[in-house]
């Protein structure tokens, strides 16, 4: 049987040209009044998926 792409993962994770996986930071969608500006600033931008999770993520994306 063919492997299928896990659509929830596909919406959250992108593969870069060099094959790295990047994702957005969590905790920056709502209820921001209670979070400090330092914290929300730190959560800005995209980060690389942790090395421990990369193999599993690639399998969910149908890349391996």
Swiss-Prot record:
Gene Ontology biological-process entries: translation
Assigned GO CC terms: cytosolic large ribosomal subunit
Organism domain of life: Bacteria
Region (Disordered): 1-29
UniProt keyword terms in alphabetical order: Ribonucleoprotein, Ribosomal protein
The keyword Transport is annotated on this UniProt entry: no
Biased composition annotated in UniProt, kind: Basic residues: 1-14
GO terms for MF: structural constituent of ribosome
Signal peptide positions on this chain: none
A Pfam entry, by short name: Ribosomal_L35p
Residue runs in coiled coils: none
InterPro entries, per database record: Ribosomal_bL35, Ribosomal_bL35-like, Ribosomal_bL35_sf
Protein family (similarity comment): Belongs to the bacterial ribosomal protein bL35 family.
Protein known as: Large ribosomal subunit protein bL35
Organism the protein comes from: Corynebacterium glutamicum (strain ATCC 13032 / DSM 20300 / JCM 1318 / BCRC 11384 / CCUG 27702 / LMG 3730 / NBRC 12168 / NCIMB 10025 / NRRL B-2784 / 534)
Lineage, top ranks: Bacteria, Bacillati, Actinomycetota, Actinomycetes, Mycobacteriales
Name of the gene encoding the protein in the UniProt record: rpmI
